[in-house]
Structure formats: structure tokens, C-alpha cells
């Protein structure tokens, strides 16, 4: 009498995890294969959808522009840093002002800095 698929499935279903692990290793050795999962590429449009759903943004001061003093004041107000720390950020542009903020907050910060004469990027 031949063994059917159902018989094999029933026998495998009754094994413990350790016994299944041993069985898989035996198959790998006997047939020269690996039980590692094969990575399958997703649809091409999936990457674009992930980029649109970004929820956290970084606000980067690209340059201070001509109104450096005004930009320093806005940086101090946004970050809560002291005068020297805010000046160091403005002088060392491009620098990240805020990290991991919502889109609305990032746009608000961008408006404040641009009103003071700075060039800002949201990443």
C-alpha cells in the first residue's frame, strides 16, 4: 500500500516542534536544499505609497540668508536653546532644527524660519 499525501500531512501534524526541526534538517541534508524563505519583490508601486505615508519629518535649516539675527531669534524660540547654541546652529547651516515632528508642525516651523529670511528644507 502506498503512502498518500494525507497520511504524510497527518504524520507531520502530530510531530512536536523539535521533531519538525529535525525533519526539516533531514530533508535539507538528503536533498541538498535550504528551508530558508525566498524574498519576493513586491509590486513596483509599493515604494511610492510608503513615501507618501511618511508621518515624521525633519526640519533642516539650509541657510540663514541675509537676516541672520532674525533667524537666530526664531531658532531660539522653536528649540528653546540659548543664544550661543542657536547662533552655532545658524552659523553651521545646513543643520537639523527639529527631528521627528508632524507634517503640520514641520510646515509651521518652515513658515516661521522663511519669514525670518532663512532657507528651510523638510525631509
From Swiss-Prot:
SUPFAM superfamilies: ClpS-like, Ribosomal protein L7/12, oligomerisation (N-terminal) domain. GO terms for biological process: translation. One of its GO terms (molecular function) is mRNA binding. It holds the Pfam family Ribosomal_L12_N. GO terms for cellular component: cytosolic large ribosomal subunit. The keyword Magnesium does not apply. InterPro entries: Ribosomal_bL12, Ribosomal_bL12_C, Ribosomal_bL12_C/ClpS-like, Ribosomal_bL12_oligo, Ribosomal_bL12_oligo_N_sf. Forms part of the ribosomal stalk which helps the ribosome interact with GTP-bound translation factors. Is thus essential for accurate translation. Belongs to the bacterial ribosomal protein bL12 family. PANTHER family: 39S RIBOSOMAL PROTEIN L12 (PTHR45987), LARGE RIBOSOMAL SUBUNIT PROTEIN BL12M (PTHR45987:SF4). This is Large ribosomal subunit protein bL12. It comes from Neisseria gonorrhoeae (strain ATCC 700825 / FA 1090). The lineage of its organism: Bacteria, Pseudomonadati, Pseudomonadota, Betaproteobacteria, Neisseriales. The gene is rplL.
